[in-house]
Regions:
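Active-site-proximal mixed secondary-structure blocks
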Residues: 13-19, 24-76, 82-182
């Protein structure tokens, strides 16, 4: 009986007025837990994003380095990232708008101006520094310096590589496609 009550409580984790990440369902629910039905139009954008991020996980993290027209470096992590094709090799990532104010991120501005990016895999040893690079600094602030990463000259593209990264993929941007409002 205790499990049934717990199951019912789990089913009510999305109250009407307030939703927080701790209220997103987990994969640890009992087998007989009722399915939670959500309509995207009923959720705020932040709640929808958290729900999608929970549902598609764990996700790899891409650490993307770009430069602007003036050669200023930007370094930013992205959890909406994956490999889409092998032949030709194609990576995708989504520099969604900032949650704070809906503005576009420097990474997007940079790849539109200089269509090159270095995508790095993030190791466990890099987690804290990667988190520091995710801070929303003003345009022009060098996240390599703020996070304590070592920039290394790339071989094929202009943005630098992260010396500490186990993998760095130097990429030319083939396409930037706007999807939705954020």
């Amino acid at each position: 009986m205790k499990n049934q009550k717990s199951c019912q409580q789990e089913a009510l984790i999305f109250p009407e007025k307030r939703r927080v990440p701790s209220q997103i369902p987990t994969f640890n629910q009992p087998e007989n837990a009722p399915m939670i039905h959500l309509k995207p139009e009923d959720l705020s954008i932040p709640d929808l994003q958290r729900t999608l991020q929970f549902a598609v996980g764990p996700r790899p993290i891409a650490l993307a380095s770009t430069i602007d027209r003036d050669g200023r470096v930007n370094l930013s992590p992205f959890s909406f990232f994956n490999v889409f094709s092998t032949n030709p090799p194609i990576l995708i990532f989504s520099p969604a708008n900032r949650g704070r104010d809906g503005s576009t991120k420097d990474t997007l501005h940079n790849v539109l101006a200089v269509p090159e990016v270095v995508i790095h895999s993030v190791s466990h040893a890099m987690v804290e520094q990667t988190s520091l690079s995710s801070t929303e600094y003003p345009t022009g602030v060098n996240e390599f310096l703020k996070a304590g990463f070592t920039p290394v000259e790339s071989t094929l593209v202009h943005p630098p590589r992260v010396a500490e990264a186990p993998v760095a993929m130097e990429c030319e941007v083939l396409e930037v496609k706007a999807l939705g409002d954020g």
